[in-house]
Amino acid sequence: MTERYADKQIKLFSLTSNLPIAEKIAKAAGIPLGKMSSRQFSDGEIMINIEETVRGDDIYIIQSTSFPVNDNLWELLIMIDACKRASANTVNIVLPYFGYSRQDRVAKPREPITAKLVANMLTKAGIDRVVTLDLHAVQVQGFFDIPVDNLFTVPLFAERYSKLGLSGSDVVVVSPKNSGIKRARSLAEYLDSPIAIIDYAQDDSEREQGYIIGDVSGKKAILIDDILNTGKTFAEAAKILERSGATDTYAVASHGLFAGGAAEVLETAPIKEIIVTDSVKTKNRVPENVTYLSASDLIAEAIIRIHERRPLSPLFSYQPKGKNNA
């Protein structure tokens, strides 16, 4: 069992979106979750009560702003306000999944940049720091005027696949869209494997007509993306890989939302295993071939390093021989 962390000035609180990962983070850090309650009135209003003193403490609030996105975001904002009014020393938020991060630019005329709006709201509420996991767009860090620590899951995935023997020239890491090339290359470098990209014509209404840049024939393919939402991107990419001669297809994503009937879509796709982290707690049905890989140890280590003013850089690399990164 993890020993109790000695510094009592640091406190962790979990809101309601993803209690399981919060409990794992607390256990890994050796810090018990603080006592608080959150309830919703019949008209939808949220009431929060912090049931212990936080005066002078460094607070870390754990909350994924996943479905229901707006309820979870407002619960977070209200908790931040409660901590500020209770004279906390610092208020830091831990977002295993950062909702609205996909709305990071104006793609069509008169569209908002909602990721920036959310950043403004959180900053105005009084937070001192953000710890998050695999932002959809890394430039969202620049929407904040406070420190943002964007942790990467690729080292976790690399360790998993290395243990499974999925590495080397017999494996190809595939980005199912051209915007994910950097992510695919990062995993491929860890695995010492080549990369491939699935691209589509400008009109991609028939997405199964995509073509592959790179060689996948006779290789085991690993599809990688940051968010698994409806599952269509992975399902369509897996069919293209199968037609192109890939022997087996695996898929990995940082955040498993499994929305809009994703289980049904993915269960008919030629994918051997799907790996996601536990950044999102979903009530939707999950395919039987899904494996959850916990990001709790990574987040817990980041929290402790931040509190102790130690560098986070060792967390951004994978040491296959278990070297000590301290």
Swiss-Prot record:
The keyword Transmembrane helix belongs to this UniProt entry's keyword annotation: no
Coiled coil: none
Residues that bind D-ribose 5-phosphate: 225, 229-233
Ligand binding (ATP): 43-45, 102-103
Record's subcellular location: Cytoplasm
Highest taxon above the source species: Bacteria
UniProt xrefs under Pfam families: Pribosyl_synth, Pribosyltran_N
Cofactor(s) for this UniProt protein: Mg(2+)
Catalytically driven reaction(s): D-ribose 5-phosphate + ATP = 5-phospho-alpha-D-ribose 1-diphosphate + AMP + H(+)
SUPFAM superfamilies: PRTase-like
GO molecular function, one term: ATP binding
Binding locations of Mg(2+): 136
Cofactor remark from the record: Binds 1 Mg(2+) ion per subunit.
Keywords: ATP-binding, Cytoplasm, Kinase, Magnesium, Metal-binding, Nucleotide biosynthesis, Nucleotide-binding, Transferase
Pathway terms, separated by semicolons: Metabolic intermediate biosynthesis; 5-phospho-alpha-D-ribose 1-diphosphate biosynthesis; 5-phospho-alpha-D-ribose 1-diphosphate from D-ribose 5-phosphate (route I): step 1/1
Cited InterPro entries: PRib_PP_synth_CS, Pribosyltran_N, PRibTrfase_dom, PRTase-like, Rib-P_diPkinase, Rib-P_diPkinase_bac
EC number: 2.7.6.1
Principal location class: cytoplasm
NCBIfam families documented for this protein: PRK01259.1, PRK02458.1, ribP_PPkin
The protein's assembly and partners: Homohexamer.
Entries under HAMAP family matching the protein: RibP_PPkinase_B
Family listed: Belongs to the ribose-phosphate pyrophosphokinase family. Class I subfamily.
Its job: Involved in the biosynthesis of the central metabolite phospho-alpha-D-ribosyl-1-pyrophosphate (PRPP) via the transfer of pyrophosphoryl group from ATP to 1-hydroxyl of ribose-5-phosphate (Rib-5-P).
Stated name of the protein: Putative ribose-phosphate pyrophosphokinase 2
Species per Swiss-Prot/TrEMBL record: Streptococcus pyogenes serotype M6 (strain ATCC BAA-946 / MGAS10394)
